[in-house]
Amino acid sequence: FQQGHQITTISQSPKTDVYANHLIQDVHQLDLTHLEPVDWVYVLLSPSQSSVEGYQQTYVDSVAPIVQALKSHPVQKIVVVSSTRVYGENAGERIDDESVIQPVDEQGRLLWKMEQLYQQAFAERCVVIRPTGIYGTSVARMIKLAATTQSYPQIHWSNRIHIDDLARFLAQLIHVEHPEPSYIVTNNQPVPLHEVIQWFQRQLNLPELVVESQKETGKRIYATRMRKSGFQLEHEDCF
């Protein structure tokens, strides 16, 4: 996994990955003075709560201390994982890497602000990654939806990427000489969410839900730059 690199991971909780030297720190008080020179950085943060305050604290308030801590290191690239939430469309529109960013909720605006702050600090050294819904660690949520959903109000387009494909794409960026400033990462197979729930219902021999309306919500997201790069998915659909 290391591919010859020395890897250090930092989080607020213990980790047991054998391939990395792990430090327990709060990124808001980040101290990298005792590390060997760091030349490649991945920023992958997750808020403890999905509120506006949670997004502000996790994504935006952490930028300045991270930037400050990295000033003494020879950073060649910083890869910042954001989200396709920065795209505010919600009527079944097609979105790709050339789409204009127009967040419509405060969480989306805060993610975009985080992106801009890192781009201002690192310019062409910054690569922003916007994954769609990440799956592959647990199907508990979908099983619960399958068991409890008898009807669905509309056709809601959903998009996803397997966690292993996302990790592989992040890792292979090290070998890309001239990366794009940003990449959407998704499996390029938008699916109405009710169809995913129905699939689980069939596997579990449960009654299939009924769709109440043909109104479209959500968005159909395509990773045009990822596809152009030649990256091959190992999990092309979620079924």
Locate each region found by the language model.
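NAD(P)H-binding glycine-rich loop region in Rossmannoid oxidoreductase-like domains
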Residues: Y19-P65, A69
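N-terminal Rossmann-fold cofactor-binding loop
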Residues: T9-P14
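Substrate-positioning beta->alpha
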Residues: V128-I134, R141-I143, S151-I174
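Catalytic helix-loop patch of NAD(P)-dependent Rossmann-fold dehydrogenases
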Residues: A91-I129
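Mid/C-terminal beta-alpha module of Rossmann-like enzyme folds, strongest
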Residues: A167-Y222
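N-terminal Rossmann NAD(P)H-binding glycine-rich loop of SDR-like oxidoreductase domains
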Residues: F1-H5
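Conserved Rossmann-fold NAD(P)-dependent oxidoreductase catalytic core, especially the SDR/UDP-sugar
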Residues: P65-V104
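Conserved sequence/active-site signature of Rossmann-fold short-chain dehydrogenase/reductase
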Residues: V86, I134-G136
